[in-house]
A protein has these predicted regions:
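Bacterial N-terminal signal peptides
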Residues: 11-21
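Catalytic domains that recognize anionic headgroups
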Residues: 22-139, 146-747
């Protein structure tokens, strides 16, 4: 009998018992809904196992290391990792608390005259002994009384540290505080290190000493159901089932014995937020193979369909929220300002008066307060804006990636409806060579000179005068490069916003290269100078944007044109230890402005979180044109026209970074941002966007349930979209190469 059939029968039996007790006729029972198929969604779960040999200096060991460790070193024959600082921390999982023998091997820093390196072991905050590290194996036992089922923290506290810089009298540039070069840790847990969690053919195999964590919201009445639980290799063992609601303590729900037939285990109250369901295979004795769960699912009698699935990006807008029929604007201008942070505009709360024309435009438009970029560098983000596809779908993520000809761009969609299309761009990353000219009758990469935004205006004015045939509406894409580095504002704006900056080397790319390689220190004075130059460039672009608005008014186009003002990404100004963009996925590079002026729409501020992928469907909707099914964004036209509700606390935006050695992914909600750094030896971080908008306090460990829940959503988004389009490889001509070098993308 299947677990769901058994669940229905159990529910019916309860009602029959109620009848016998005189409770009246039972209400009809709905079949239970599957909240999660634990085999189908195994790739969304987190899997842990008890530690065995931790080979320090290898990527595999990094999953256990937290603070107090340097980078991996060595070669194929010998690898190690230095401690860095007075303590090093290790986090490891145990299926069950018990005495664990531990072997430690490392070599102390070779400091002349230094005493023996004594290392104190603190386990979950309790001192459990001391070992001397001498290059040979040191042995101890981690006592059961200080251990616990689940996560454990082991801190290695060193008797002394030394700095190579100080030891060499300043000749070394190594400022680390070193104590031990660690080779290995060996936990004698008896875990099968070659084991693996497998899910296939309706069977979920879980080795002893391993755990599966599944993250989801559970509706009332949720149960764990499976056809059977069996053991492998003759071991007895049992399955420990535990549940941890967000913000609450983990509680054991039950222990299941193999061979007892179909299972329906009520999970109890999980609250309304995310919860972690943990399944741990416990051995009846040390060693053994593990357990097999047959067709395991999470189910509930009245689970809403939305609970069962990871939220999808939606393009459809309910009929009740569709824009009302009536006159439609004819033309569209997409004005993109490269590398512009939202928080450096007055209309977004910035105190310096760098954006009076943009602010005036915002007062007669719809300002989206929270807009998330799909990447932190130009090409993937702009490709998303121009296609309505997420980076994992359009495939344009790397330095040489070119948009597939199979992709359908916004320009092509409008061209097919009779629109004249033109694009004038100033960043080589969106040159025709990268496929972004698809659907444009005219598409020009302008050379950078003077104020690039002014050049763009001149090109646009010329096209409106002589290139645009007034027999049909137009779509005009204008991509301005300032305030993208290098910061070279025109003299009037530099004199106003950066009058104290006299060092001309700050207006080239070399200053950023030196900051990156450490040959130039980011002093407060230097940081302020660069910030002033950045603001001066914003002011220059603002003035040019004001001229464009005046041009539209003079040409009689203002009342018949949708104007979309947006940025591709922001700019880091050393908030997280770096400069520019394309290196992280923090707020300063992902939070961008989006201001839309649609004739007749009025002015308002929308608090709902939106994202760049929404721009293309929004433009189509405002024009009264159909949105192709391939488009992944959601039309914002109902919010622009004041016909939709406000905030959505569960709205999610996904962003990716995969270029020049920087690899990361993130999911952003109005309350949280999870960043998963996918570089070697990296991890994940979680930030409370309300309490910590600057994203400086990592809560990933403290809020592990929320972290796992958001990560599952991120992985599900990637699973749905991976490999949708295959990017091509771009070919650079010499002129494009020079442009990319000038912007710092090539050296």
């Amino acid at each position: 009998m299947s677990p769901l059939r058994r669940f229905r029968r159990t529910a019916l039996s309860v009602c029959l018992l109620g009848l016998l007790a005189g409770c009246g006729r039972p209400a009809p029972q709905r079949p239970p809904e599957t909240v999660r198929d634990l085999i189908a969604d195994l790739d969304l779960a987190e899997i842990q196992r008890e530690p065995g040999v931790v080979d320090l200096g290898t990527p595999g060991a990094r999953t256990l290391l937290r603070k107090g460790w340097s980078t991996d070193e060595g070669d194929a024959s010998h690898h190690f990792v230095w401690s860095d600082g007075p303590e090093s921390e290790i986090v490891f999982f145990l299926a069950a608390a018990r005495d664990i023998p531990l072997i430690l091997k490392g070599s102390p820093y070779p400091a002349p005259g230094a005493p023996a390196q004594a290392v104190t072991l603190l386990l979950n905050g309790t001192s459990v002994g001391r070992v001397t590290i001498s290059g040979e194996e040191a042995r101890t036992v981690l006592p059961e009384k200080a251990l616990r089922s689940g996560e454990n923290r082991l801190v290695l506290r060193y008797a002394w540290t030394r700095s190579p810089f100080e030891e060499s009298g300043g000749k070394s540039d190594d400022h680390r505080r070193l104590a031990v070069a660690w080779d290995l840790l060996r936990f004698a847990t008896g875990v099968d290190e070659q084991g693996r969690v497998r899910g296939a053919g309706g069977q979920l195999s879980l080795p002893f000493g391993w755990r599966i964590d599944s993250f989801q919201r559970l509706p009332p009445g949720a149960v764990l159901a499976m056809d059977d639980l069996r053991s492998r290799g003759g071991e007895t063992g049992e399955l420990r089932v535990a549940l941890q609601p967000e913000g609450g303590a983990e509680r054991e729900v039950g222990r299941l014995q193999p061979g007892s037939g179909p299972v329906v285990l009520p999970l109890g109250d999980a609250g309304t937020g995310p919860a972690r369901l943990s399944l741990t295979a416990l051995s009846g004795k040390q060693g053994g193979n593990g357990l097999v769960l047959w067709r395991p699912v999470l189910a509930a009698p009245h689970a809403p369909k939305a609970t069962a699935a990871i939220p999808q990006t939606a393009t459809a807008v309910p009929a009740s929220l569709r824009p009302a029929a009536g006159p439609r604007p004819r033309n569209v201008i997409l004005y993109l300002v490269d590398a512009l942070r939202a928080d450096h505009l007055g209309c977004y709360g910035y105190s310096r008066p760098v954006s009076p024309h943009i602010d005036a435009f915002a007062r007669q438009a719809v300002l989206f307060r929270h807009t998330v970029a799909q990447s932190s560098w130009t090409r993937p983000a702009t490709t998303t804006i121009l296609t309505g596809l997420l980076p994992r779908t359009h495939g344009v993520n790397g330095r040489r990636d070119k948009l597939s000809e199979q992709a359908l761009t916004l320009a092509e969609m409008l061209q097919a409806r009779g629109y004249h299309t033109a694009g004038f761009v100033t960043n080589g990353n969106v040159a025709r060579s990268f496929g972004l000219g698809q659907g444009f009758e005219t598409y020009e990469l302008l050379p950078r000179k003077h104020s690039a935004a002014t050049d763009v205006n001149a090109a646009a004015a010329g096209w409106l005068e002589s290139g645009w045939k007034r027999d049909a509406p137009f779509f005009l894409y204008l991509h301005t490069v300032e305030p993208h580095a290098p910061y070279t504002p025109p003299a009037p704006f530099r004199q106003r916003f950066a009058p104290e900056v006299h060092d001309e080397t700050l207006t080239g790319m070399r200053v950023f290269h030196r900051l990156e390689d450490g040959s130039l220190a980011p002093t407060p004075e230097l940081r302020q100078s660069l910030l002033d130059l950045y603001d001066a460039e914003i002011a220059a672009n603002d003035a040019a944007f004001g001229e464009l608005i005046d041009l539209l008014a003079r040409r009689g186009l203002w009342e018949d044109t949708v104007v979309v003002f947006i940025s591709d990404h922001g700019e880091e100004l050393f908030e997280h230890g770096g400069w520019e963009h394309g290196k992280t996925l923090h707020s300063e590079v992902l939070d961008v402005p989006l201001i839309v002026r649609a004739p007749g729409a009025g002015a308002r501020t929308v608090q709902r979180q939106v994202q760049q992928v929404d721009v293309a469907p929004t433009i189509l909707d405002l024009l009264g044109l159909p949105i192709p099914p391939v488009v992944e964004g959601r039309s914002l036209a109902p919010w622009i026209l004041g016909q939709a509700p406000g905030d959505d606390p569960d709205a999610e935006a996904y962003s990716w970074l995969d270029q020049h050695g920087f690899r990361a992914a993130s999911v952003t909600t109005p309350a949280w941002r999870l960043i998963e750094d996918r570089a070697p030896n990296a991890g994940r971080s979680l930030y409370d966007r309300q309490a910590d908008p600057g994203e400086h306090r990592d809560l990933a460990d403290e809020r592990a349930v929320r972290t796992g829940y958001l990560r599952a959503h991120l992985l599900a988004a990637e699973r749905r979209r991976k490999g949708a389009l295959q990017a091509g490889t771009a070919v650079f001509d010499e002129e494009l190469r020079k442009q990319l070098q000038a912007l710092g993308y090539l050296r």
